From Swiss-Prot:
PROSITE patterns: ADENYLATE_KINASE. The lineage of its organism: Bacteria, Pseudomonadati, Bdellovibrionota, Bdellovibrionia, Bdellovibrionales. AMP binds at residues 31, 36, 57-59, 83-86, 90, 158, 169. The gene is adk. GO terms for cellular component: cytoplasm. It is found in: Cytoplasm. It comes from the Bacteria. Monomer. This is Adenylate kinase. It catalyses: AMP + ATP = 2 ADP. Coiled coil: none annotated. Pfam families: ADK, ADK_lid. Pathway: Purine metabolism; AMP biosynthesis via salvage pathway; AMP from ADP: step 1/1. Residues 30-59 are annotated as: NMP.
Length: 211
């Protein structure tokens, strides 16, 4: 089954995607990872995406759709779309792309988390500059402060995880992404999961939904 996993920044999409990859053999298509790889490689799309991400703004559809299409053209199956689509316009463009490629989405799962919890999660998040491993200063700190447990790389706070940018990101999310709920409710593929719980509890509920 192909899934869309969506919710506000910090809702736990990446964490749940990792579990689905390890336990269900699924493939994650994370637009955030695609952006960061493009930025690190200093590609044309990466440079354009960085300008928007650093301000906490949504990356334009033309850039996002292009990156997703490139991945799907490699023949990926049983995938999770993490962080995409973020708007109804993107969802419509995705539907057109999937029809063209003879693919479909089985479920669109929304992770619901209160705004104050999202702020706490995001401002405390730290990421390895080298391998992308994710930590949290309270719930999942690295063993040595500022150093990645996995590769020894520098652990930093991303620009888009700073308080002033987060506030913009969450407001942008509410404005553009919330209508996605209605879009997928109409398609009959929408399911909501309480993301403000233990990681395992959230995973078990998602597992039931996809079986």
């Amino acid at each position: 089954m192909n899934l869309i996993l969506f919710g506000a920044p910090g809702a736990g999409k990446g964490t749940q995607s990792e579990l689905l990859i390890k336990r269900q053999g699924m493939t994650q298509i994370s637009t955030g990872d695609l952006f960061r790889a493009a930025i690190k490689g200093q590609t044309d799309l990466g440079k354009k995406a960085q300008e928007f991400m650093d301000k906490g703004q949504l990356v334009p559809d033309s850039i996002v759709i292009g990156m997703v299409e490139e991945v799907l053209q490699k023949g990926v199956q049983n995938f999770i779309l993490d962080g995409f689509p973020r708007t109804v316009a993107q969802a419509q463009a995705l539907d057109e792309l999937l029809v063209k490629m003879n693919l479909s989405i089985g479920k669109a799962i929304f992770l619901e988390v209160p705004m104050r919890i999202l702020m706490d999660r995001l401002t405390g998040r730290r990421v390895c500059k080298n391998c992308g491993a994710v930590y949290h200063i309270v719930s999942k700190p690295s063993k040595v402060e500022g150093k990645c447990d996995l590769c020894g790389g520098e652990v930093i706070q991303r620009n888009d995880d700073k308080a002033e940018v987060i506030e913009t990101r969450l407001k942008t999310y509410e404005e553009f992404t919330s209508p996605l709920k209605e879009f997928y409710k109409k398609s009959g593929k929408y399911t909501e999961v309480d993301g403000n719980r233990d990681t395992e509890e959230v995973y078990k509920e998602i597992e039931k939904i996809i079986k």
